[in-house]
A protein has these predicted regions:
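Alpha-helical transmembrane bundles and membrane-interface segments of multipass inner-membrane proteins
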Residues: 1-188
Length: 188
């Protein structure tokens, strides 16, 4: 039977197509709906891990799916932003973030197969938080630009800063993860 933290993780994944559909419609009401769906999905990320630790319900499924659900949610948002030509969200940003996620996921799978534990780092947590802040801020800024068009330059500048921070933390956390797993990655 699936426990509550795992149900929350699955629920987060189920919300992704709804978020994407609402966002890509592009009307004001659908952007509000997309933001609300995204906020609910992001909130489940906070609570599934908390509940799993609090009630000792940590599972292999959760260890794999929770970070994967985060990656899918964030990448879905970034791809939607690129599709809608959101300034500063381009293929280079997406490739850097996706490459890091694929490399780290690959290392994580190898580590699990070898019963090798790579401790979570503050860099990985900061990376995830920065990506969630970026994706939520972009949606808020888009809505804000419709309400107060005069602030568009401010929103653009803030988006650029958030993109730089998210990409920098993505690269740093990826390097940190590779460095911590160097013994595992020694090819024999």
């Amino acid at each position: 039977m699936m426990n509550t933290p795992n149900k929350l993780t699955v629920f987060r994944v189920i919300l992704i197509p709804f978020f994407m559909a609402f966002y890509l419609i592009g009307s004001t009401w659908s952007q509000v709906a997309a933001l609300l769906v995204y906020l609910v999905a992001a909130a489940t990320d906070r609570y599934d891990g908390y509940l799993a630790r609090k009630y000792n319900q940590i599972t292999t499924f959760g260890k794999l799916m929770d970070p994967l659900a985060d990656k899918i949610l964030i990448m879905s948002a970034l791809i939607c932003f690129m599709q809608r030509d959101v300034r500063y969200i381009n293929a280079v940003v997406i490739v850097i973030i996706l490459a890091r996620e694929l490399i780290v996921t690959g290392i994580r799978l190898i580590a699990m197969g070898e019963n090798y534990v790579i401790a979570a780092s503050i860099w990985g947590k900061a990376k995830t938080v920065s990506q969630f802040i970026l994706t939520i801020a972009v949606m808020v800024f888009e809505l804000g630009s419709k309400i107060i068009p005069q602030l568009e330059v401010v929103f653009d500048t803030a988006t650029l800063i958030l993109v730089i921070v998210a990409v920098a933390l993505t690269v740093i956390s990826g390097w940190d993860y590779i460095w911590k797993s160097r013994k595992l990655l020694t090819f024999k």
